[in-house]
């Protein structure tokens, strides 16, 4: 039979039939595997989730429905899964601790109000001192411009 791109190629009907047969075979295989039983939108759907036979065996879920199985879990793999699950738990705890720290960093509104009240209670001398110190801090925060050479990297003269 000539190839799909040859000059005397077969009719489109043959190609479409072949594609339909392939898709039907894939669909029936997915249905036999139980991937089409719940709709993709439901919570019980396994569609799009990672499938791990060793993890299913470790958790005690049945992978095969028959009495004889070829799926076993080695001791080394079981230890590895156990270690990885501990790491996941530690990571979750770390995320919780970091979230608690983030929420603890919020500024209390009452303390901000009390500091404003203290500054209002002080006299004019204290206000002058604070304004002078704030001006000094502003000057110290500005950039210090350092004079460099006269146009060369070594600082020598530059003749264009």
From Swiss-Prot:
Any Pfam family hit: Alb1
Cellular compartments per GO CC: cytoplasm; nucleus
Location(s) in or outside the cell: Cytoplasm; Nucleus
Keyword Cell division: no
UniProt keyword Cytoplasm, yes or no: yes
Location, primary (coarse class): cytoplasm
InterPro entries, A to Z: Ribosome_bgen_Alb1
GO BP annotations, alphabetical order: ribosomal large subunit biogenesis
Annotated segments matching region Disordered: 1-58
Recorded superkingdom: Eukaryota
Alphabetic keyword roster: Cytoplasm, Nucleus, Ribosome biogenesis, Transport
Protein family according to the UniProt entry: Belongs to the ALB1 family.
Quaternary state and interactors: Component of the nucleoplasmic and cytoplasmic pre-60S ribosomal particles.
Task performed by this protein: Involved in proper assembly of pre-ribosomal particles during the biogenesis of the 60S ribosomal subunit. Accompanies the pre-60S particles to the cytoplasm.
Protein name per UniProt: Ribosome biogenesis protein ALB1
Organism of provenance: Eremothecium gossypii (strain ATCC 10895 / CBS 109.51 / FGSC 9923 / NRRL Y-1056) (Yeast)
């Amino acid at each position: 039979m000539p190839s799909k791109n040859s000059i005397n190629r077969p009719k489109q009907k043959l190609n479409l039939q072949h594609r339909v047969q392939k898709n039907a075979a894939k669909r029936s295989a997915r249905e036999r595997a139980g991937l089409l039983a719940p709709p993709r939108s439901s919570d019980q759907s396994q569609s799009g989730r990672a499938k791990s036979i060793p993890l299913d065996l470790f958790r005690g879920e049945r992978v095969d429905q028959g009495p004889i199985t070829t799926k076993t879990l080695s001791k080394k793999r079981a230890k590895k899964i156990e270690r990885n699950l501990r790491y996941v738990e530690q990571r979750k705890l770390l995320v919780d601790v970091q979230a608690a720290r983030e929420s603890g960093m919020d500024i209390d509104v009452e303390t901000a109000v009390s500091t404003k009240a203290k500054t209002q209670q002080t006299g004019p001398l204290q206000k002058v001192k604070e304004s002078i110190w704030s001006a000094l801090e502003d000057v110290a925060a500005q950039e210090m411009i350092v004079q460099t050479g006269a146009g060369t990297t070594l600082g020598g003269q530059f003749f264009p």
